[in-house]
């Protein structure tokens, strides 16, 4: 797939900016806080309807403007598609494909696929379990767009069940309350779908990431990725997962009512990353943690390509400066011209002449993009 054009209106610090991509690799050069990352974020939103910055929709819209708009033209093996995403301060979104508004956002997902790699991704190793859950969910949305709807359903039931548990805190109702049993059943049904899909996705991703990690580390370190769901998972069969889920809910009913929150379910899952059988967050240097994240990102690229049968876009947000020369070379050698790549950087000295000669170079200053070097 190839992103041909991108048009941003009132998005972040872009007032009205069109970009045409003319090479497999585009390098966006500029000082910090000029808008380089914002452009990559716009592409990420088209791919996943999510931002790794965890921003609210009102953060995307320029002050005193009612909406922000992202338009793009994408070329795939199946033909050319025009994508449109309108963001509003109140969080209501409109998506359109080839000029036709789509009733379900799920139908917009999967048209454009992209893997984002930024310095924030080191949090995958050293951050909280929520960071790893969000990463896995974002990958799953691209592998299986219906997952976005499943996850939304689960989160909605979870919010409603938590609200009901808070009511029970100050009432005389017991754990045998019939309304709670209804919420339990809904949580189990939707949560089981989340658990099974996360388990399947990691089962496919883990061997790819392990192989990349072995290659990058020179076979000196062994990476293991384990999905440890909050609900005990013996076999990935829906009936067994549902039974285990319901049993754990019933066991934790008293502490749940006491605390007014749901203590069982995939919102408490963990993805364990270990190097040489030691938790990665405790293991070694930042360089070793970067190797792990690089292996995860290369595995994402490979898995998405296997599933969708086309190479996804790669969005590299100021990460080359964070990698040592050997890891840089591993990444750049993998990319070549196989993946359309958008790269942000503050200077061009990280790139060798061959890369620069085969790349489109754009300069970014205060939300304006040009082919001149005025921002140097």
UniProtKB/Swiss-Prot annotation:
Domain of life where this protein originates: Bacteria
Family statement: Belongs to the RecF family.
GO annotation, cellular component aspect: cytoplasm
Localization annotation: Cytoplasm
Keywords on record: ATP-binding, Cytoplasm, DNA damage, DNA repair, DNA replication, DNA-binding, Nucleotide-binding, SOS response
Residues annotated as binding ATP: 30-37
Principal location class: cytoplasm
GO biological-process terms attached to the record: DNA replication; DNA synthesis involved in DNA repair; double-strand break repair; SOS response
A Pfam family assignment: SMC_N
The protein's name in its UniProt record: DNA replication and repair protein RecF
Gene Ontology terms, MF aspect: ATP binding; single-stranded DNA binding
CDD domains for this protein: ABC_RecF
Function: The RecF protein is involved in DNA metabolism; it is required for DNA replication and normal SOS inducibility. RecF binds preferentially to single-stranded, linear DNA. It also seems to bind ATP.
PROSITE patterns, per the entry: RECF_1 (PS00617), RECF_2 (PS00618)
């Amino acid at each position: 797939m190839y992103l041909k054009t991108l048009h941003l209106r009132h998005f972040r610090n872009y007032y009205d900016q069109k970009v045409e991509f003319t090479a497999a690799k585009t390098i966006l050069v500029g000082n910090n806080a000029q808008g380089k990352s914002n452009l990559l974020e716009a592409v990420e939103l088209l791919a996943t309807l999510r931002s790794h910055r965890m921003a609210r929709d009102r953060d995307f819209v320029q002050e005193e403007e009612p909406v922000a708009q992202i338009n793009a033209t994408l070329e795939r093996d199946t033909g050319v598609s025009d994508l449109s995403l309108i963001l509003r301060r109140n969080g209501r979104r409109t998506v359109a494909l080839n000029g036709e508004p789509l009733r379900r956002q799920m139908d917009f997902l999967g048209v454009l696929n992209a893997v984002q790699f930024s310095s924030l991704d080191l949090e995958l190793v050293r951050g909280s379990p929520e960071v790893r859950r969000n990463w896995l969910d974002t990958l799953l949305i691209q592998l299986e767009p219906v997952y976005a709807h499943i996850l939304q359903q689960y989160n909605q039931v979870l919010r409603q069940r938590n609200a009901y548990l808070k009511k029970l805190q100050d009432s005389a109702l017991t754990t045998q309350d019939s309304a709670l049993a209804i919420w339990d059943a809904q949580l189990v049904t939707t949560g089981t779908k989340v658990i099974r899909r996360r388990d399947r996705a990691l089962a496919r991703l883990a061997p790819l990431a392990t192989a990349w990690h072995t290659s990058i580390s020179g076979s000196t370190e062994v990476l293991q990725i384990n999905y440890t769901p909050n609900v005990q998972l013996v076999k990935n069969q829906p009936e067994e997962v549902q039974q285990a889920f319901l049993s754990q809910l019933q066991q934790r009913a008293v502490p749940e009512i006491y605390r007014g929150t749901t203590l069982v379910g995939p919102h408490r899952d963990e993805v364990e990353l270990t190097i040489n059988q030691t938790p990665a967050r405790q293991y070694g240097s930042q360089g070793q943690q970067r190797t792990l994240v690089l292996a995860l990102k290369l595995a994402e690229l490979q898995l998405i390509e296997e599933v969708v049968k086309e190479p996804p876009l790669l969005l590299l947000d100021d990460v080359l400066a964070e990698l040592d020369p050997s890891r840089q070379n591993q990444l750049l050698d993998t990319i070549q011209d196989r993946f359309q790549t958008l790269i942000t950087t503050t200077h061009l000295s990280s790139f060798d002449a061959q890369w620069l000669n085969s790349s489109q170079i754009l300069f970014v200053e205060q939300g304006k993009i040009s082919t001149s070097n005025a921002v140097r």
